[in-house]
Amino acid sequence: MERLAGKIILLSGASRAFVGFLAGLLAMFAQPPFGIFAAAFISFPMLVWLIDGVATHPDEGVVRRLLPAASIGWSFGFGYFLGGLWWLGNAFLVEADLFAWAMPLAVVGLPAVLALFYALAVLVARCLWSDGVGRIAALAVGFGVAEWLRSFLFTGFPWNAIGYAAMPMPLMMQSASVLNVATINMLAVFVFAAPALIGTGKGARVGLAVAAALFAAHIGYGYYRLSLPPPQPLTPERTVRLVQPVIDQAKKMDDRERAVIFEEHLALTAAPPQAGGKRPDIVVWPETSIPFILTDNPDALARIADVLQDGQILVAGAVRAEDAGTGLPPRYYNSIYVIDDRGQIVGASDKVHLVPFGEYLPFEDVLNSWGLSSIAANMPGGFSAASNRSVLTLPGGRTFYPLICYEAIFADEVDGSARLSDALLNVTNDAWFGDTPGPRQHFHQAQLRTIETGLPMIRAANTGISAIVDARGVLVVGLGYNYKGVTDAILPGKMPTMTDSMLRGRIFWFTGVFLLLVAAISRRGLNFRTN
């Protein structure tokens, strides 16, 4: 281990950047669909040793002293995000004649931009760097700050946060009932990076002992929580049917296929109950599953009424149109409708957190003012964002907290009012991304919201992964990717959580300050010995 550490420490220039890239790429294998937990225990020690090799001189300017560290962080981040987000390019091939030109911007450009956050992480860490366990704490602080900023800056994109690598299965997800993802990010980096101490010796006993204790607590708490009785269904029980139609995205966008698509959803809705099961009370369709403006098609509402049996409720993703006033084009919302057995819309909720460049064009007014209206007109999007999230109340009193598409990756989208609901509802359409890691990563991140909130999740996805997940993050029923069909299950009940979002936020700041003090004291000790 010492020999390997020495070789990595002595790297410089392009060799150092390339190894940083490989370390980031390796770290990505700890995320879904691979979930190779051990990969992070190799990649982060490599990162520590690369930073160890950054030599600075007092007579150099601040930029020259910090730039090598930032470049290491950027190389690591570029490998990590390129390996984890390449599948975004699939979306640009659905209408390749219009958008294939933009594919490199997503596949290479987005990882290059996101890598700047990890450049910042290493930059912060390098300012506090020392030669013992303090540098492990410094790296944890740096990544904690970077991942926290990534969760909200520029509308936020916390996809594949480092902490998810420490939670590959429900057993290792239970810490999220106590800590938020931001805290888990920091502690995960500390644990992943601690083996670097073996390669350099100093502080190894203390650092590895702390890392082992954190890891043991993480696993032990998971065993404890999963050993508790599973949450019991609320009374009266409600059976939920998930419809997974597997409609190709190109077909969804073909106007000639609209009627066929609608009838496919209805046929799956009307399928008989599964063997030994009861008739579903609630049927859930995926995001934008209704292929037209439903309020403009009374015949479609009548068809829904024909298919639904007495007392059944349909919850379906749809595009909702709203009159914007005389002479103005209508506003469109990515929405969820609740429809009763008479074909009446009895509830609706609109998406709050839209996808930049996918559902709306940032700075569209600026582009138009610069005379670039043709670019704005040819970009995807056109949705308006809701000003607030409306909880869906179903006939009979059940309440669902809606999360449309990638809203489910944002822990902060689920506020305190969610606990008043009976379940989280996530509808999505991942057909854009094909059979790639993307849909698996999306499901994994959505799954964690159940443990944070103590609520079960109902998840309907066009091409998968559709599932009902209980409040412990355990899969009750599910449909794999590209499996066309339905699955029914009784909706599980709630489960208490150890902390609320406010307390978790305080724990994050306390943990960050504590690690910062450890790093600062170690740094001060290094300076004292040097002088």
Curated annotation (Swiss-Prot):
Catalyzes the phospholipid dependent N-acylation of the N-terminal cysteine of apolipoprotein, the last step in lipoprotein maturation. Its EC number is 2.3.1.269. GO terms for cellular component: plasma membrane. NCBIfam families: lnt. Keywords: Acyltransferase, Cell inner membrane, Cell membrane, Membrane, Transferase, Transmembrane, Transmembrane helix. Belongs to the CN hydrolase family. Apolipoprotein N-acyltransferase subfamily. It is an enzyme of class 2 (transferase). It comes from Sinorhizobium fredii (strain NBRC 101917 / NGR234). This is Apolipoprotein N-acyltransferase. It comes from the Bacteria. The keyword Membrane applies. Residues 243-493 form the CN hydrolase domain. GO terms for biological process: lipoprotein biosynthetic process. The chain crosses the membrane at residues 8-28, 34-54, 74-94, 105-125, 128-148, 178-198, 206-226, 501-521. InterPro entries: Apolipo_AcylTrfase, C-N_Hydrolase, C-N_Hydrolase_sf, LNT_N.
